[in-house]
Amino acid sequence: MTTAYASALAAMPTLTELAANHTSHAVLLGTNFFGINTIPIALNEADYARMWIQAATTMSIYEGTSDAALASAPQTTPAPVLFNGGAGVASALPAISAATLDPASIIGIIIEILIQLFLISLEILFAIVAYTIIIVLILPLVIFAYAIVFAVLAIIFGPPLLVIASPFVLTGSVIAVPTSLSTSLSTAVPIGVGQYLADLASADAQAIEVGLKTADVAPVAVRPAAAPPLRESAAVRPEARLVSAVAPAPAGTSASVLASDRGAGVLGFAGTAGKESVGRPAGLTTLAGGEFGGSPSVPMVPASWEQLVGAGEAG
């Protein structure tokens, strides 16, 4: 049994070989650009399968050897049942606890777990990097291939489609022209502008009519209301209450009123008068006394107004 166990342990693949195989597999997958590592990856997977087959064969041989050894061992009679087995159980507990809590086995288990976690994280990292590189390199090629395919399809099927769609395009154009004209006119002219133009025309006509009527006005006689004459007071003549005679008001004088042929003129401030000879301002404006070393008049007023009486040039 001991020899069979030692032989099986020596024939089994070691953890170092398994870790090296996993690392090589991750590196090959991460650098497999355009399938350049296809053959090395296949060899790596074949080596991994070989290790599995080797381990399975070794375990099968060891299982057969152990079964044969157990079958060839002499069968002993079972031990009698012990009613008071406290001493034996108590003596077996330290051995069981020592075998279970062996520091070497615990450290080995922890190391194996850490190695597996490292290998798994390394595979995930290499897979992410590999797929990212593959996407970055292949995506432009895929887009370029699609562009070429669509360009070829457009060259092949473009002219027949244009010939088929030309009647529909002409029909749409004929329908769209009057619609676009009506839409543009409705959006260009504001709502209610017709009423505004009609009111403006009627206002201009009324202004012209009033002007013509003003020009043809004839002198009009106006009879101003005369003030009632002063009569004697009732205190002087008490009988005025009984007999009262109403004297007719004297006839007033007629006055003629004509429309003026000039307006009120240019209005300004008090104490100033406008000059009709001064033209409308145009271009730059030059103040009086604007030569070098001069000073403005006090007070400074527009050039179209007379200066105030007594205002002189400032020295």
Swiss-Prot record:
Name of this protein: Uncharacterized PPE family protein PPE66
Family to which this protein belongs: Belongs to the mycobacterial PPE family.
Ranges in a coiled coil: none
UniProt subcellular location: Cell membrane
Segments passing through the bilayer: 81-101, 106-126, 133-153
Main subcellular location of this protein, as a coarse class: membrane
Membrane-topology descriptor: Multi-pass membrane protein
Domain of life: Bacteria
Species per Swiss-Prot/TrEMBL record: Mycobacterium tuberculosis (strain CDC 1551 / Oshkosh)
Entry keywords, A to Z: Cell membrane, Membrane, Transmembrane, Transmembrane helix
One GO cellular component, as annotated: plasma membrane
Pfam assignment, any one: PPE
UniProt GO BP: response to host immune response
InterPro entries: PPE-PPW_C, PPE_dom, PPE_sf
